[in-house]
Amino acid sequence: MAEGSVMFSDVSIDFSQEEWDCLDPVQRDLYRDVMLENYGNLVSMGLYTPKPQVISLLEQGKEPWMVGRELTRGLCSDLESMCETKLLSLKKEVYEIELCQREIMGLTKHGLEYSSFGDVLEYRSHLAKQLGYPNGHFSQEIFTPEYMPTFIQQTFLTLHQIINNEDRPYECKKCGKAFSQNSQFIQHQRIHIGEKSYECKECGKFFSCGSHVTRHLKIHTGEKPFECKECGKAFSCSSYLSQHQRIHTGKKPYECKECGKAFSYCSNLIDHQRIHTGEKPYECKVCGKAFTKSSQLFQHARIHTGEKPYECKECGKAFTQSSKLVQHQRIHTGEKPYECKECGKAFSSGSALTNHQRIHTGEKPYDCKECGKAFTQSSQLRQHQRIHAGEKPFECLECGKAFTQNSQLFQHQRIHTDEKPYECNECGKAFNKCSNLTRHLRIHTGEKPYNCKECGKAFSSGSDLIRHQGIHTNK
C-alpha cells in the first residue's frame, strides 16, 4: 500500500464494555453512524475491501465491544505476534500500549496524552523505529496528516465529542438542551420553528433532519435489523431497541423531581411534567383546544378531517386511533384481558375495568356544577349536562326528532328501519331495544324485581310499579 493511503484501523475506535455502557442511546447511534460512514467512504475510495467484524456487528445492531481488536492488527504481522494492546480509553484521552514481550523488546508500558490525531501518527512512527523499522514506518505504510482526507480528520473529533458529553457549548434557548456540534444544534432548532426540509420520496412526509428520513424509510421497507434477545421483538433503529429493553430490566432512569415518579423514556417524563406545570403546548388551529402531547393533537385533528385510518377487517368499521381498533377487535375475538379482582368480571379494555371498579368503591369523581349530581364516568356527566343546556345534538334525518345521546338516536332509527335485532330464545319474539327484551324475558322467568313499599306487591317492570303506586296516592 503506497504512502498516503489509509486503513480501516486508522479511522476506527474501539470501546470496552465498561466504556460502551457509559454511553446513552444517542451517543451510541452517533458512534455507529460515524463508523459505518467512514467504512463506506473507504470502500468508495477503493482503499479497503474486506469487511471488519466490528462493521458487521454494527450493521446487525450488536455491540461493537464484542470485537477485541488489537490496535496493531493489519499493520504488521511481526508486530501482531510480539504485541497486544489495551483498548483505547477516549474518556481519559490517553492511548495506552502494553507490549507483551518487554524483555525482548526492551520497551515498557507507554501512557501518552494526545492533543491531535497527528500525535497518534507520530507515536506510531516512534514505536516502529524501536521495533526495527529505520524509516519509522511499518511494512504497510500509514498515511500522514497532510495527506489525510477531510472525513478522517473529522472522525476523531466526532468520536471525542461522543465521550466528552460535558463539552456542549451550543445550548438551545427554547428548551435548554445542549449540543457538542453546531450542525446538531441547527437541526434541533428546526423542531421549534417547525422547519422540515428533508422529504421522504415514498410518501412525501417531511423531516427536520436527514437521519430521521433514513429511519422513517424502514417503515416502507419493513426493515427491522435490531432484535431483542429476550423476546425476539425487532426494531427499525437501535435507540428503539435500547428503550424496549428497559421493559425487561425494569430500568426507569428518568425521575420526576416533583413527585418522584420514574419513567423508562425521557419523552414520557416530559409529558408527565406537564401535569404539574399545566402546560399544553399543542393547540388545534381549527377549534383552539390544547393538548399536552403532540400525539393527542394529531389524533384530535382527525375529528375535523373525518380521517379514520384504522379499519376492522372483520366488519369494516373504521377508527381514528389504533388503540380503539384493538379494543373493537376484542368484540369479534371475545377477548377480555382486564379482570376485576373484586368480583372476577372481565372487560375488553382497561378503561372499562376502571369504570366498573367504581361500583365497588362507590367513587363518583365527575360532579355536575348545575345540580351537584355525581357520575362514575366523564361521558355520563357530559350526557347529563345536555339536560341543563337543553342540547340535543343527535337528530334523526327521517323525522327530525333530536336526542341527547347518540345511542338514543341509534335505537330510535330502528323504528324507521323496523330492525329488531334482539330476539327471545324462548318464543322467538324480537325487539328493537335490549331493555325491551330484558323486560319481556321476565314473562317466561316470572321475575318481578320491582316491589311496592306500600303493599308489597311486585311487578316485572318499573313502569308497571309507577302506575300501581298511583292507586295509593289517589286514596
Curated annotation (Swiss-Prot):
InterPro entries: KRAB, KRAB_dom_sf, Krueppel_C2H2_ZnFinger, Znf_C2H2_sf, Znf_C2H2_type. Coiled coil: none annotated. A zinc finger (C2H2-type) spans 170-192, 198-220, 226-248, 254-276, 282-304, 310-332, 338-360, 366-388, 394-416, 422-444, 450-472. It is found in: Nucleus; Cytoplasm. Its main location: nucleus. Expressed in heart, placenta, liver, pancreas and with a higher level in skeletal muscle. One of its GO terms (cellular component) is nucleoplasm. Belongs to the krueppel C2H2-type zinc-finger protein family. This is Zinc finger protein 383. It comes from Homo sapiens (Human). The lineage of its organism: Eukaryota, Metazoa, Chordata, Craniata, Vertebrata. The gene is ZNF383.
